[in-house]
């Protein structure tokens, strides 16, 4: 989940009547620490800087962690490691820029006498207050689209993962089942506190990442393993754009080391690891995490939709649930149409993450401080490792140009090409994407290694 997505998710903490409106009063109930036990305060009460880091860290990997080894097989080990570090640094920089813009917006508004007590500042408010309504609309459009497809990916990932515990049902059937389960999020009024979910999410993804790394090392390299590396530009840039999305190099490199080119046809890392209790535990934890992430991603979309149709003041939970169905049903439908776990991640990374995480924050920072007076009165000066404002502008310009050309341009071309190829190969509404081919009766007792997987 990107920093921009974190901003829209923050709207879940606002009062229901004012959700997603960049100019709302956004009041929330003041939490009284004396009303609960020390344990409940520790687990439930949020809102601190640490909670922001917990939330970002717990949502940063999610299901994309399982496709990073697939990306490494497209890139090769060296390029994979280099790009992980490179995009990790760029992502950290743009996250810093977003925090600077938040501070700047708050400082300017406080000078005007605005009180931010019990108010959750949203990313769209920041863009609106610093750069105008056009920027607010752009930010809202990109983030809502990102959340929409992020929710689709969670459903696809749920079906893909559970299949490796129970393959008696095909992935499309599992998508029906998990779509129905995730549709129950329409009954959730809002998320007032995130800390417990952040703890859980961080624990689940940490376990899965280390399971992938340790299980791959213990398994060792498969017989005749090959690490061909990049063979086609389409594959190379497809893998590179998936790394735009997240960070998890220790798991990805270990799985690629063990299985090599076999990952080119197995976008979900679980598919190659031996079935045992450790893997089943990782699958179950990821399923829970994906359900939580689906709720985090969908809830702000519900608020936007309620605002559009004028249902945001409705007190009835059932009426609001009915009003939210036009949001969740298309998400469910899209997950059934395009079940391409892996390729869809790269497409979302290239076409949406490029802007929400990298381009928009860097451009917004450049335009906010374009005048000498803005730089002179800035609430946050350049960091100690930046010698001047000019250096910051150069770095921001590099981020914009690099991501626009390499991430959105080449990455978008490669990801869309690969996505279309999956549609041509498997068709829409694919019953079981990358599942085992049926075993003919004559070879029913052949060794497991003789079974092959579809592309």
Per-segment meaning from a language model:
Residues 63, 88-100, 179-187:
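Central hydrophobic cores of alpha-helical transmembrane segments in multi-pass inner-membrane proteins
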Residues 66-71, 125-129:
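Generic transmembrane alpha-helix signature in multi-pass membrane proteins
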Residues 3-7, 44-45, 50, 102-143, ...:
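Membrane-interfacial loop- and helix-cap regions that link adjacent transmembrane helices
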Residues 69-113, 117:
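Extracellular loop-to-transmembrane helix junctions
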Residues 1-70, 91-96, 118-120, 430-433, ...:
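Membrane-interface "cap" regions at the ends of multi-pass membrane proteins
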Residues 67-77, 189-198, 250-254, 262-269:
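Hydrophobic, small-residue-rich membrane helices and short re-entrant helix-turn-helix hairpins
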Residues 49-66, 179, 242-249, 405-407:
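The first (N-terminal) embedded transmembrane alpha-helix
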Residues 71, 184-189, 333-339:
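Hydrophobic alpha-helical transmembrane segments
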